[in-house]
A protein has these predicted regions:
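Binuclear metal-dependent hydrolase catalytic cores
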Residues: 6-9, 22-248, 257, 331-361, ...
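Extended, charge-rich low-complexity interaction segments
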Residues: 375-404
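A polyampholytic, Gly/Pro-enriched intrinsically disordered region
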Residues: 363-377
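N-terminal export signals
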Residues: 1-21
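Short glycine-rich anion-binding loops that position phosphate/pyrophosphate groups of nucleotides
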Residues: 228, 275-276, 391-392
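Cap/insert and terminal regions of metallo-dependent hydrolase folds
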Residues: 237, 243-246, 254-352, 442
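Short, charged/polar, Gly/Pro-enriched secondary-structure boundary elements
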Residues: 2, 322, 361-365
């Protein structure tokens, strides 16, 4: 049936339509650029988001191609995943480079060493590792480094800095002592050799209760720490201050007032993130929703809380790491942050590179090969760090094989002449019970054994 509308009704309908059209055409309200930037600048990007002086390629970071200036900080995320292990994400580790000569590491999770080597950091120079707490996803690659760094030329102890625990048995020192025991089969093989001291660990264990205490103060670099609420006593956060620049890594834990206090106005604020969607999170983790809720609610910082905490801190750049970076959840994670924090925010996922000066910040991704080998430190570095700048010309060493292997099993080795081409036979490095070695040759400054 055809329904006829009178003039009055038609006028009312037209009025409603006009009102709806006017509402649709109203300018957007509520969101403005947090920094007062002009049109075309976005709503969260600051005017200081610009390449820093050392940046040579604005799109990607190519290792060894960009020496840092004396007033610049570079932060590289070498790992960003708590659990489960992923091809795209190693365990949490953040490398901070300061100017021309200083490098520190914050946490050292499983798989991070692969990324550090891919970034062409010489293995002997991987040192000064700060642990936020003693869950394995924050230090599991230390034993791997510990075994091979002396082989690669670090003949002095590995330096590890971390918190005490409620008891001595639960602190960083105890963990490192047990790791040395675990690796005794490896370190024993270096007995009597120049690299033997490289299997020692120099532990700086600070009192975790000393909020605001200084655990590192060298060469103009100061690192302070404070407690975090995460699973057990001992979890800590760090703030690094150097040359007017600053960096915070909270480690794991619930959002807290101490972090808001000690991280205030930091240049780069990095915290962890757990997506507060319990059923989905549990599904992806392979656990029950109960376990999911229990874990998030008691141990971690929800994505909403990341923004809340960042708003209290007011950094120049806020970042989240230690998060499973699921692409379909990027919008949700960002929306949660944006509820409370309107400033510059980014995810610190594997290979993320952040350059920082006092007036600029720039973020890129490192361009790395799938296969990479080890970069060597300079001979000058090895002489300075292994011998204090004065390298001896020769050293007397004892063969470690005599004490570590029964001669009977060595006697069963097949003669190399039976399988090696004649023109490829060389003098095999068979050590007598005691011998003198040329240190320059041993470090690689001389020649390899001749044929």
């Amino acid at each position: 049936m055809l329904k006829v509308v009178g003039p009055a009704a038609a006028g009312m309908a037209a009025g409603v339509a006009s009102a709806e059209a006017a509402e649709e055409n109203k300018p957007a309200t509520g969101e403005t650029n947090a920094y007062g930037a002009p049109p075309g600048a976005g709503i969260s990007m600051p005017p200081y988001y610009l390449p820093t002086p050392s940046v040579k390629n604005r799109n990607n970071y190519f290792p060894q191609s960009e020496p840092l200036g004396p007033d610049e900080m570079r932060i590289i995320f070498m790992g960003s995943q708590p659990w489960p292990p992923r091809l795209s994400q190693a365990g949490t580790c953040i490398m901070v480079e300061l100017g021309t000569s200083k490098r520190l590491f914050f946490d050292f999770g499983p798989g991070c060493l692969r990324n550090i080597i891919a970034n062409q950091v010489p293995v002997p120079e991987i040192n000064d590792i700060f642990l936020t707490h003693l869950h394995l996803d924050h230090y599991a690659d230390i034993p791997y480094l510990w075994q091979f760094a002396p082989f690669n030329g670090r003949w002095k102890p590995l330096r590890v800095i971390g918190p005490s625990g409620r008891t001595a048995a639960l602190g960083t020192r105890a963990m490192c002592e047990h790791m040395e025991k675990m690796g005794a089969w490896t370190s024993h093989q270096a007995a009597g050799m120049p690299m033997a001291d490289g299997y020692e660990i120099e532990v700086t264990e600070f009192d975790f209760r000393d909020d605001g205490g200084v655990c590192y103060d060298k060469d103009g670099v100061k690192v302070t720490h404070w407690r975090r609420s995460h699973a057990a006593d001992g979890a800590s956060a760090y703030r690094l201050d150097w040359n007017g620049l600053s960096f915070v890594w909270t480690g794991d834990g619930k959002p807290d007032q101490l972090t808001a206090k000690y991280a205030k106005n930091v240049d780069v604020f990095v915290t962890e993130m757990a997506v507060d969607m319990v059923s989905l999170w549990a599904l992806k983790q392979g656990v029950s929703p109960y376990i999911g809720a229990w874990t998030i609610d008691n141990f971690h910082t929800m994505h909403y809380a990341v923004g809340y905490l960042a708003n209290l801190v007011q950094p120049r750049l806020a970042m989240a790491t230690h998060v499973s970076f699921d692409r379909e959840l990027i919008g949700e994670m960002t929306a949660g942050v944006r509820m409370h924090y309107k400033g510059m925010f980014a995810f610190g996922i594997d290979h993320t590179v952040v350059n920082v000066t006092k007036d600029r910040i720039w973020i890129r991704e490192a361009a790395l090969p799938e296969t990479s080998n080890v970069a060597r430190p300079s001979m000058e570095w090895m002489i300075k760090n292994n011998f204090g700048g004065n390298m001896p010309t020769e050293m007397t060493v004892k063969s470690p094989f005599l004490a570590n292997q029964e001669q009977s099993i060595r006697d069963l080795e097949i003669d190399p002449a039976l399988f090696t081409p004649k023109d490829q036979m060389r003098q095999w490095a068979r050590m007598p019970a005691e011998m003198k070695i040329d240190i320059a040759d041993f470090l690689g400054g001389g020649q390899a054994p001749k044929k």
